[in-house]
């Protein structure tokens, strides 16, 4: 892995180390954290936590959470531990494969599991090994879903962000095991097709599916400066660390 650099998140509230090149978490991780309906005192596991951006953004927003992360790549797991320590966040970071979880995780149950599974299927090359592992799946999306559901307590919540063209695959994986599905499309600009979606499902839930209006990230027709271009809602999430109220509780 190339030398890491520190990036500010939530308006500088967090200072998190990530590789200078290759896979780096950004707005998607912050959006994932904002959508998780966790409450103080609950237990949260992130699958594929990388350097811990989503997990620690969630921990910064909701006090008193019991945080755990699972990361395949040792270098990223090491950065997550460093980030937790330097930002004063208590978290247990485990290095291992979600298909064969470490025994310490297999013995636990969580109120929430969050994940940003690889966006691309296997077979597409990436120039950087770390980026390739993070962005291109070696474990099928359905296995991510099953692994997350196994770690949830009954009635627990699974929160996932994924590309919109894999939404059908994700919903099929949830069928029969989780319900009360809520889908929040994420569009770059008003009137544009959504490129991402956050999907939240409850283990054992029976409520009907809900499709929400898109969350729009940018105001202007073309991209200029992030700080000026973000919608008010996106500013509140990305810069101020606010949550996204999806009406789940």
Residue ranges, per PLM feature:
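Conserved SAM/SAH cofactor-binding pocket of Class I
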Residues: 34-127
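Conserved Class I SAM-dependent methyltransferase catalytic core
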Residues: 21, 140-194
């Amino acid at each position: 892995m190339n030398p890491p650099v520190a990036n500010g998140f939530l308006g500088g509230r967090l200072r998190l180390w990530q590789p200078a090149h290759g896979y780096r978490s950004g707005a998607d991780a912050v959006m994932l954290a904002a959508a998780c309906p966790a409450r103080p005192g609950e237990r949260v596991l992130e699958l594929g936590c990388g350097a811990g951006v989503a997990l620690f953004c969630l921990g910064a927003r909701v006090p008193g959470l019991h945080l755990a992360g699972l990361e395949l790549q040792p270098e990223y797991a090491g950065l997550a531990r460093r980030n937790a320590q330097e930002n004063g966040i208590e978290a247990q970071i485990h290095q291992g494969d979600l298909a064969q979880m470490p025994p310490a995780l297999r013995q636990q149950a969580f109120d929430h599991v969050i994940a940003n599974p690889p966006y691309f299927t296997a077979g597409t090359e990436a120039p950087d090994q770390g980026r390739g592992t993070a962005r291109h799946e070696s474990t099928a999306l359905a296995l991510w879903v099953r692994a997350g559901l196994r770690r949830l307590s009954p009635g627990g919540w699974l929160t996932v962000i994924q590309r919109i063209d894999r939404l059908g695959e994700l919903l099929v994986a949830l069928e029969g095991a989780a319900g009360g599905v809520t889908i929040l499309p994420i569009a770059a600009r008003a009137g544009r097709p959504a490129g991402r979606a956050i999907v939240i499902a409850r283990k054992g839930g029976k409520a009907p599916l809900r499709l929400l209006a898109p969350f729009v990230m940018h105001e202007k027709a073309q991209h200029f400066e992030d700080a000026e271009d973000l919608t008010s809602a996106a500013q509140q999430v990305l810069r101020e660390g606010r949550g996204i109220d999806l009406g789940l509780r």
